[in-house]
Design a protein with these regions (language model features):
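Short amphipathic alpha-helices and their capping/turn segments at secondary-structure boundaries
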Residues: 32-44, 80, 113-130, 135, ...
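Conserved N-terminal glycine/acidic-rich loop preference
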Residues: 129-131, 152-188, 197-246
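Charged, often glycine-rich, active-site loop that binds/positions anionic groups
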Residues: 94-116, 258-273
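Oxyanion-hole/transition-state-stabilizing segment in secreted/luminal serine hydrolases
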Residues: 56-58, 109-171, 203
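Serine-esterase "nucleophile elbow" of acetyl-processing enzymes
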Residues: 36-94, 148-154
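Catalytic His-Asp segment of secreted/periplasmic serine-dependent ester chemistry enzymes
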Residues: 201-300
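Structural recognition of the beta-strand scaffold that forms the well-ordered cores
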Residues: 44-49, 53-54, 85-90, 127-132, ...
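Secretory targeting and sorting signals
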Residues: 1-37
Length: 300
């Protein structure tokens, strides 16, 4: 997870990471969880993706600690629902290139080795693959980190990303589209019988935002969520074009964004109110994402 410089943001992450380490919940091994062992008759399920899928800082952590892979992320919750045999290789900071390249890992700027290419988990007999990717290719979390302000009269950061009439975020999203297509084609090549499920990203902030609770101006709240929505559209289009099934997580997330009460939120804001990374799903969110994916699988 790339951390912003917002003091409250960094302090909250360091506190949670320290608590996990002290209680022994942060396991710094590179092993695939024991649940990955193939069982006779069980659906063979591989989970690929970035921190939205890995569930950083949601206890308990399994695998490389810098990947932030939670035993309560949507993959683990879904595998439990399906009775599937899971290989979860999701990892915070992963981009599309890390499907076929190893990923250098660090936490709070401390090097922590590397994670193997995520595609190493795929097998010819894999039955189900889930994928959540794109946020790091397009840098959307980094953009959100740079849009915070406690000054209601500040210049909207939206202007910075549209200087000279150039839609910088739109360019990044457009550049990501063919990369996703290649990833999906490669999954089919490696696991030709697998059902491939691709999720979009959720609803992070409601229209107009909730400044100063979440310290982004109303126009920037709409700019940020609008960028997520545009990327979701690209993910849906590429999924349809490359034989994958798209799961919309944003629409069902209405009323569960970072502006809501702690018990209602599926995603955390800049300073979390639950054990989860800033600007990422909490356990409630991961469980609901698993329910949405499970309902899709069982209904079609």
């Amino acid at each position: 997870v790339n951390l912003p410089q917002h003091k409250g943001f960094c302090r909250s992450v360091r506190t949670i990471v320290g608590a996990l380490a002290l209680t022994g919940l942060a396991v710094g091994t590179g092993a695939v969880p024991a649940s990955a062992a193939t069982e006779d008759g069980a659906t063979s399920y591989v989970a690929l993706g970035d921190s939205m899928a890995s569930g950083p800082l949601i206890p308990d952590i399994t695998g490389p600690v810098a990947c932030g892979r939670s035993t309560h992320n949507y993959a683990h919750e879904l595998a439990s629902r399906l009775g599937a045999s899971l290989r979860d290789v999701t990892c915070s900071g992963a981009a599309s290139k890390h499907m076929t390249e190893k990923q250098s890992l660090s936490l709070l700027d401390i090097p922590m080795g590397s994670a193997p290419p995520q595609f190493d988990a795929l097998r010819p007999d894999t039955d189900l693959v889930t994928l959540t990717i794109g946020g790091n290719d397009t840098g959307l979390v980094g953009i959100a980190q740079k849009c915070t302000t406690l000054d209601p009269n500040a210049t909207p950061c939206k202007e910075k990303y549209n200087e000279g009439g150039v839609d910088q975020v739109g360019q990044r999203i457009a550049e990501f589209a063919p990369k996703l297509g290649v990833v999906l084609d490669s999954i089919h090549q490696r696991s030709p019988h697998a059902r491939v499920i691709v999720t979009g990203y959720g609803l992070y902030i409601k229209p107009g935002g909730c400044w100063p609770l979440q310290p982004v101006l109303p126009v920037d709240a709409d700019f940020l969520q609008g960028s997520v929505d545009r990327m979701n559209t690209v993910i849906a289009e590429q999924s349809a074009a490359h034989g994958a099934e798209y799961i919309d997580l944003a629409t069902p997330s209405k009323g569960h964004d970072s502006c809501q009460a702690p018990s209602d939120k599926w995603v955390e804001g800049y300073v979390p109110t639950a054990a989860a990374a800033p600007l990422h799903p909490n356990r409630n969110g991961e469980e609901n994402y698993a329910a949405l994916i499970g309902a899709h699988l069982q209904g079609s």
